[in-house]
Swiss-Prot record:
<keyword id="KW-0472">Membrane</keyword>
<dbReference type="GO" id="GO:0005886">
    <property type="term" value="C:plasma membrane"/>
</dbReference>
<feature type="topological domain" description="Cytoplasmic">
    <location>
        <begin position="329"/>
        <end position="402"/>
    </location>
</feature>
<feature type="glycosylation site" description="N-linked (GlcNAc...) asparagine">
    <location>
        <position position="29"/>
    </location>
</feature>
<feature type="disulfide bond">
    <location>
        <begin position="112"/>
        <end position="194"/>
    </location>
</feature>
<dbReference type="InterPro" id="IPR000276">
    <property type="entry name" value="GPCR_Rhodpsn"/>
</dbReference>
<feature type="topological domain" description="Extracellular">
    <location>
        <begin position="107"/>
        <end position="122"/>
    </location>
</feature>
<feature type="topological domain" description="Cytoplasmic">
    <location>
        <begin position="67"/>
        <end position="85"/>
    </location>
</feature>
<feature type="topological domain" description="Extracellular">
    <location>
        <begin position="174"/>
        <end position="210"/>
    </location>
</feature>
<keyword id="KW-0812">Transmembrane</keyword>
<feature type="transmembrane region" description="Helical; Name=5">
    <location>
        <begin position="211"/>
        <end position="231"/>
    </location>
</feature>
<feature type="transmembrane region" description="Helical; Name=3">
    <location>
        <begin position="123"/>
        <end position="143"/>
    </location>
</feature>
<feature type="glycosylation site" description="N-linked (GlcNAc...) asparagine">
    <location>
        <position position="5"/>
    </location>
</feature>
<dbReference type="Pfam" id="PF00001">
    <property type="entry name" value="7tm_1"/>
</dbReference>
<comment type="function">
    <text>Could be a receptor for neuropeptide Y and peptide YY.</text>
</comment>
<feature type="topological domain" description="Extracellular">
    <location>
        <begin position="1"/>
        <end position="45"/>
    </location>
</feature>
<keyword id="KW-0807">Transducer</keyword>
């Protein structure tokens, strides 16, 4: 009996020694491990992503849900993005962090399958939501007076991104499974690895290579193309509008200060559009390239260190999206300040948004209370369309529609 217990203790000791990926011993039984310091670094990075990403997306969700005026078709896509990014931060990031830090899976087979597919679903939904926001903004410019058409297209976009996300997540649900590494019934010890099994992929209708390429196209290439196309067209419309305004300013007022204001606003708006595209492209490219190299065995072995860096960079997108689509949005900033005031965090509001933004918020609230916002309801169709487009572009200039 003593020898059995001693053997079990040895098994547990070996298990504890090889389970953690980041350690001082670089190679154990042919398995390469990463330095312990890198384990601390990657854990800290994931914790920051989880914390700030969850808070930023949660605030965005709360603002839209609690304020009826914010429940517009355009903000509906931002809400959808915030929901998907929130679950990326509280589900995908922690689960991946655990699989990066530890070799063996301590949970059930069902949780292994759910974790694999849910991680993919959240990522697909997040990136498709980003593309839908860009396309929705583009449609808003092309059909400024066709509100019913805009709503129908937006509804179609919403249904489409959920359906495609679910379809792309199904193969991950099938392929993810447990692989037994060590089973010792006498010690009640069983070690399993949760991963996508090549044997299951070979039995499926779609191969792993085909699936990886399909994900590269649908999750990265197509959304990136949508962002570049939509925002380049929007930027072109804005450029024409800025040129006309600058010409009018020069002709009528000849005021260099106002010209500089027009140029600065154009530069700031274009910079924001470029940032939207750049953040998506830079954040998701390394992870997609890694999956291509790993799937087609262009590298000798799977590197946990390389994967964790690529995945951590992709997760940064979930943190930056609330900044790009909400905190840089004028209407959202106003509502965030209202929210901070409502929960008694006025000092924090001033720290985050500054005195100038707080003053603008007070002036806007007073302006609304006096009935300063009016809507033009009668005009010739062509004139009304130009006015609508002009108002939309003006809103975008103030970062209200991105």
């Amino acid at each position: 009996m003593g020898s059995v217990n001693e053997s079990c203790d040895n098994y547990v000791e070996i298990f504890n020694k090889i389970n953690y990926f980041f350690r001082d011993d670089q190679v154990i039984n042919g398995t390469e491990y990463s330095p312990k310091e890198f384990g601390y670094f990657i854990t800290f990075a994931y914790m920051l992503i989880i914390l700030f990403g969850a808070i930023g997306n949660f605030l965005t969700i709360i603002v839209v849900i609690l304020n009826p005026a914010m429940r517009t078709t355009r903000n509906f896509f931002i809400l959808n993005l915030a929901l998907s990014d929130f679950f990326v931060c509280i589900v995908t990031a922690p689960t991946t962090l655990y699989t990066v830090l530890y070799m063996f899976w301590p949970f059930s087979r069902t949780l292994c399958k759910i974790a694999g597919s849910l991680q993919g679903f959240n990522i697909f939904l997040s990136t498709f939501s980003i593309a839908s926001i860009a396309v929705d903004r583009y449609v808003l410019i092309i059909f400024p007076t066709k509100r019913e058409r805009q709503q129908n297209l937006s509804f179609c976009f919403f249904i489409m991104i959920w359906v495609i996300s679910l379809i792309l997540a199904v193969p991950l649900l099938q392929a993810s499974d447990l692989t037994p590494v060590f089973v010792e019934p006498s010690c009640d010890l069983a070690l399993y690895i949760c991963h996508e099994q090549n044997e299951i992929w070979e039995k499926m209708i779609i191969s792993k290579g085909t699936y990886t390429l399909a994900v590269l196209i649908t999750q990265y290439a197509f959304p990136l193309f949508s962002l570049v196309f939509a925002y380049s067209r929007i930027a072109h419309r804005m450029k024409l509008r800025f040129a006309n305004r600058n010409q009018n300013v020069t002709t009528n007022t000849n005021t260099s200060q106002r010209r500089r204001s027009v140029v600065e606003r154009q530069r700031r708006t274009h910079l924001l559009l470029v940032c939207v595209v750049a953040v998506f492209a830079v954040a998701w490219l390394p992870l997609n390239v890694f999956h291509i190299f790993n799937t087609f065995e262009l590298v000798n072995s799977f590197s946990v260190t390389t994967f964790s860096i690529c995945h951590c960079l992709a997760m940064c997108s979930a943190c930056l999206n609330p900044l790009i689509y909400a905190f840089f949005n004028h209407n959202f900033r106003i509502e965030f300040m209202h929210l901070f005031d409502r929960v008694g965090l006025r000092s924090l509001r001033v720290v985050i948004f500054g005195e100038q933004e707080s003053l603008k918020k007070s002036m806007r609230t007073e302006f609304r209370s006096r009935g300063g916002c009016k809507t033009v309801t009668t005009a010739e169709p062509a004139t009304f369309q130009r006015m609508n487009e002009s108002m939309i572009l003006s809103a975008m200039e103030q970062d209200e529609q991105l």
